[in-house]
From Swiss-Prot:
Protein name in the entry: Argininosuccinate lyase
Subcellular location: Cytoplasm
UniProt xrefs under PANTHER family: ARGININOSUCCINATE LYASE (PTHR43814:SF1)
Gene from which the chain derives: argH
Broad class of enzyme this protein falls into: lyase
GO cellular component, one term: cytosol
Species of provenance: Pseudomonas syringae pv. tomato (strain ATCC BAA-871 / DC3000)
UniProtKB keywords: Amino-acid biosynthesis, Arginine biosynthesis, Cytoplasm, Lyase
Amino acid sequence: MSTDKTNQSWGGRFSEPVDAFVARFTASVTFDQRLYRHDIMGSIAHATMLAKVGVLTDAERDTIVDGLNTIQAEIEAGNFEWRVDLEDVHMNIEARLTDRIGITGKKLHTGRSRNDQVATDIRLWLRDEIDLILSEITRLQKGLLVQAERESDTIMPGFTHLQTAQPVTFGHHMLAWFEMLSRDYERLVDCRKRLNRMPLGSAALAGTTYPIDRELTCKLLGFDVVGGNSLDGVSDRDFAIEFCSAASIAMMHLSRFSEELVLWTSAQFQFIDLPDRFCTGSSIMPQKKNPDVPELVRGKSGRVFGALMGLLTLMKGQPLAYNKDNQEDKEPLFDAADTLRDSLRAFADMIPAIKPRHAIMREAALRGFSTATDLADYLVRRGLPFRDCHEIVGHAVKYGVETGKDLAEMSLEELRQFSNQIEQDVFAVLTLEGSVNARNHVGGTAPEQVRAAVARGQELLAGR
């Protein structure tokens, strides 16, 4: 069975219809139909411009615009029939427009190609998606600031190599994720700036012979600038790759955060409690409360990384200008945007609801000689070289391992066997509070600095 070639806008050159399987294989309407709002937006701007330069009459423009608005309403009401034989979102909408308003509908495509049309649609769509994602990042960051302020004095162990390193505050830890998300936000803002160049008017690849006004169309569609080269305009997908790169970094951050949450909820850590609404159980083990949300976010990072690699591979061998390969740009881009937005939404809902277990985190911070560096710094202030202090404290830690005593649990006599510079005042620096309070500088873990960082973060978010 084959399709009727008269269904195709380009059928005039062909002597036989496209094979039915090939029609399905080459069609993109099953996934690019989500561009319909932006396709209609671009078409309305294009028709408005064509009327201004005299290619369309004002009456024709109005008929086209009314028809397109009606089609959008049909789509949003679920009354639009998407046809695979019409290939894509563009031809489906154009065919329906012609059905509704007659021959005037066939004039809409004057001065443009699907090549610059789809390049415009994707940029418009991604611009809106980035705005939604930025709002979710901000919402998540607000939740992190809530936790950081609430838990600015809550002490927990800080880790390197997943081994106890130094005491930090839970609030300070939350602010580390705030910083990462700020960089993610900035990358996406930069990506949005670069993608906001209008390719419409590039036509198939060389521009058009019609007296188009690209500056008008650019203004109507909210682009910052008109693209400077028609070949590049229809073939450029850097913006999609850049978005997937920024999305991959953001998902990497969320994946790392997820790993910590999974660890912290485990019976081996028990640092935090996740509300039941963010967890699931087991079909066989009645006791289980599984942290599915962070686990899924951790797993979904691979989808976004794959989208980035897929787009890089897609583009690496293409000559100028447009090639059918580019039809494959949409599904990975769509999936990357959906995955990042949904992951951010899940985290933005979950993070403010986390309940730290203060006593357990404090007890964990008391294990592992987390104030060893503080003892070394104490000896430095007594006039000893740091490397000598490092050696001295190393011996003290070895003694603690052998005797089962933390540094703060040793007597002054025991500590002085490693250095006669140690006096009674050493115990003030060996406490958890003494350790975190001593890091009282910008970027440090002292509660005072955590609260100051929260204030700066709130000011940053208020300025967006």
